[in-house]
Amino acid sequence: MTPSLGIASLPTSSSVGSALRNLRILTKALRYHALPRTAPVPAVPHYTGPLMTRDSADTLRRAHDKGAADWQGSLDLGRSQDTVTLDAEGFGFRDQHYPWPGKLKDRTLYYWDGEEFAPISRYSGSLIKLVPTEWGAPTFEIDGIKMLPTSKLSPFEDARRKVELVAPAGKVILDTCGGLGYFAACALDAGVGQIRSFEKNADVMWLRTLNPWSPDPDAAATGGRLHFSHGDVSQQIEQIASGSVDAILHDPPRFGIAGELYSQVFYDHLARVIRKGGRLFHYTGAPNKLTSGRDVPREVEKRLGKAGFKAELALDGVLAVKR
């Protein structure tokens, strides 16, 4: 419901103060709605069946072979614990029975597609694949290139550290390249006011519906705060109103894949849409300067400075504040 501005009560000082407070609330809400009205992602229920790996399938079979009638553990990448019933034909999970999977490959996640356990991967010019990790939260690969860091900590916890840099509580945030949605999920956990997320790749969007660590925009817990759109942010940024966001999370693909998201033109747009004092975290990774011939983080820092930010290296990227 739109807050009342209390205009009829302006003659008293208390009602003036109330009206001004309501006006600030309404203004902040309207700033979010100044973001472009791209088509939202059609509601696709998130998968709730078992997610299998070669190791988890072997674990269930060993338990059955030892005579166990059930097994307790997680078949949703560590998000919850369930009691799984075991029999000669397969296993029962959340009131549904599944046959024993056939031969499974290493470093591959499988979901029940209604007929069999199928790998969570697609090929549309590039092979895109959801990949299990020792941390629970998966990463994903494009043509064998890992898109999220996993060597030292969970990709989800890595995202949380970066999101904390922009202090998301109560803010309107632009998430330029949604990916698996870990930035958005961590911002939601931290009490973000609204977050608008774009994703260009339809196959990555499909991965999200199968990943229990990816936030569901339609879930009750999200409270309508996550608006997820299929779109190219390098184009959509032109439609976003100036000064309409409080903070930005920018996690683009590698420079060689999406150079337009590292361009001065794009950075100028980021500076335009964020309010003065707003924070931006730009993930760059740590590309090898000797093999690549360039220092991408320093180049980003310099371009952001030219766009109107005060920028410095932080974690594996650049943290910038709008001057």
Regions inferred by a protein language model and the residue ranges of each:
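Conserved SAM-binding loop of SAM-dependent methyltransferases across substrates and taxa
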Residues: 180-192
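A short glycine-rich, Lys/Arg-flanked "PGG" loop and its adjoining helix->strand segment in the class I
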Residues: 264-276
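Conserved beta-strand signature within the Rossmann-like core of class I S-adenosyl-L-methionine
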Residues: 277-284
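Class I S-adenosyl-L-methionine
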Residues: 288-323
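S-adenosyl-L-methionine
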Residues: 201-240
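A short acidic, Gly/Pro-enriched loop at the edge of an enzyme's catalytic core
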Residues: 238-249
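N-terminal auxiliary segments of SAM/dcSAM-dependent transferases
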Residues: 36-132
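Conserved class I S-adenosyl-L-methionine
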Residues: 170-179
